[in-house]
């Protein structure tokens, strides 16, 4: 199965841009750009400090050690000024490359508990997955500031992480 990779992008302008001489947008205009991607992974929920009964009661079917899978949707939002020369807040090729290398290559078609180091001792909930993705990206995005990581486990369940508050 081939990874679907990047699905779409969106940009939100924080406020109306001002014009500078020559028609260039003001450098202080902040734009939020979101790149969307999909990946498939499996996981299970288990806390070794809980009794078997507690694990079953708290995590239900998600406590099955054989795991279950999801087709996750990831949205990564960066923010920054619009470059007056290119018109971009970020070069999308660079952003796609970082997402592929740091996130999709590491998580796609993986059993998170057993194949992804962040989850060897951490329960791979959607909350913890969003935090782990943030940690993977926060120092790799030199082209713009990481603003938000959104992870959809299902179409009606997602987590937003904005970094440490």
Q: For each predicted feature, which ranges?
A:
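Charge-rich, low-complexity N-terminal segments
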Residues: 2-165
């Amino acid at each position: 199965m081939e990874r679907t990779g990047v699905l779409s992008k969106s940009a939100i302008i924080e406020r109306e841009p001002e014009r500078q001489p020559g028609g260039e947008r003001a450098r202080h205009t902040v734009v939020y750009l979101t790149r969307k991607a999909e990946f498939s992974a499996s996981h299970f929920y288990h806390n070794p400090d809980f009794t078997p009964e507690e694990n079953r009661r708290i995590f239900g079917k998600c406590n099955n050690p054989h795991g279950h899978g999801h087709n996750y949707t990831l949205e990564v939002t960066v923010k920054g000024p619009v470059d007056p020369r290119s018109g971009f807040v970020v070069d999308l090729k660079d952003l796609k490359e970082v997402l592929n290398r740091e996130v999709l290559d590491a998580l796609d078609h993986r059993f998170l508990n057993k194949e992804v180091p962040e989850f060897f001792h951490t329960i791979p909930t959607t909350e913890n997955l969003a935090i782990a993705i943030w940690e993977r990206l926060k120092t790799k995005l030199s082209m713009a500031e990481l603003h938000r990581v959104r992870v959809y486990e299902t179409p009606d369940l997602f987590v937003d992480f904005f970094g440490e508050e």
